[in-house]
Amino acid sequence: MSDLIAKTTLDQRIAALVTPVIEDLGYELVRLRVMSGKSPTLQIMAEKPEGGIEVDDCARISTEVSATLDVEDPIEDNYTLEVSSPGIDRPLTRLKDFDTWVGYEAKIETTELIEGRRRFKGALAGTEGDEVLIEIEEGTIGLKFEWLSDAKLVLTDDLIRDVLKGRKDAGQVDEAQFDEIQTIIDGDDEPPANTA
């Protein structure tokens, strides 16, 4: 399992418990984190294999994962379970994510210095073997997937427009609730004037 999905030993232990549950429901685990604090929070990001996830899907995952964790009890204290989608400016945690989001801007951090730096920002150019390709100012470079400590999409107008268009085309958007979506998809910067 990639350390980008589950970083700490506890995260990895819990991921090993819940991944089969999530996959049996027809979803994929994108990221899992136990956030410490006064009251710990277990954050799970999941999606359908083809991408996307709805509130009902999150509730279904939450119910099944809760049942498993109640039996296994990997977190000693009381905690809050949060199940969500990866969001538009999603983390990139699996090698396939870097192929899915080719052309979109991303921020990548490495565990060690690579050519004097740890942070890279640029357009994703896919993968080649076990390397993630990213176009930076100096040109396209390859970073071994195992070198990555963090990676996520950068929220840009193009990303928002394309994700909304994809959701609309897939019938996942109720246009009656979001009248500014067509304007955004069409490339206009201003939402329609309120005529009420």
Swiss-Prot record:
<dbReference type="InterPro" id="IPR036847">
    <property type="entry name" value="RimP_C_sf"/>
</dbReference>
<dbReference type="GO" id="GO:0000028">
    <property type="term" value="P:ribosomal small subunit assembly"/>
</dbReference>
<dbReference type="GO" id="GO:0005829">
    <property type="term" value="C:cytosol"/>
</dbReference>
<protein>
    <recommendedName>
        <fullName>Ribosome maturation factor RimP</fullName>
    </recommendedName>
</protein>
<keyword id="KW-0963">Cytoplasm</keyword>
<dbReference type="InterPro" id="IPR003728">
    <property type="entry name" value="Ribosome_maturation_RimP"/>
</dbReference>
<keyword id="KW-0690">Ribosome biogenesis</keyword>
<dbReference type="InterPro" id="IPR028998">
    <property type="entry name" value="RimP_C"/>
</dbReference>
<comment type="similarity">
    <text>Belongs to the RimP family.</text>
</comment>
<dbReference type="InterPro" id="IPR028989">
    <property type="entry name" value="RimP_N"/>
</dbReference>
<dbReference type="Pfam" id="PF17384">
    <property type="entry name" value="DUF150_C"/>
</dbReference>
<dbReference type="Pfam" id="PF02576">
    <property type="entry name" value="RimP_N"/>
</dbReference>
<dbReference type="InterPro" id="IPR035956">
    <property type="entry name" value="RimP_N_sf"/>
</dbReference>
<dbReference type="GO" id="GO:0006412">
    <property type="term" value="P:translation"/>
</dbReference>
<comment type="function">
    <text>Required for maturation of 30S ribosomal subunits.</text>
</comment>
